[in-house]
Amino acid sequence: MVENAGGSELAAVLQALADPARLRVVEALSRSPQRAGDLAAAAGVPAPTMSKHLRVLLAAGIVTDERGARDARVRVFRLRRESVVAVRAWLDQVQARWDEQLRAFKAHVEREGRR
């Protein structure tokens, strides 16, 4: 999903996550797979709005869907672990660079303070 951390795939994932209702969907799916109607209730949005949110999350590769075993009309949505891992890896890289910059700044200030 996010092989190139600076690429358009990561941007699509972050853009998809930039909506509070979609964040609530991701939180709900992190607990268990769910149907669209249940997700709409959890996110506090009407069913048609949830359908739009789910299309965005599917297109970004954040969730997957499958047809219900007993009823093919029912779709069950699941969070893709890979999408969460990829975003976390990118954030960890950004944090590591930031931490390195802070260490370098601290060392600089300490050197200057000794003069």
List the predicted regions and their residue ranges.
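Amphipathic alpha-helical dimerization/coiled-coil segments
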Residues: 1-8, 27, 82-115
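Short, hydrophobic-biased segments on the C-terminal half of alpha helices
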Residues: 54-55
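Charge-dense, helix-prone N-terminal extensions
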Residues: 35, 46, 63, 107-110
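N-terminal helix-turn-helix DNA-binding core of bacterial DNA-binding proteins
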Residues: 2, 8-49, 74-85
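Beta-hairpin "wing" of winged helix-turn-helix
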Residues: 38, 59-74, 78
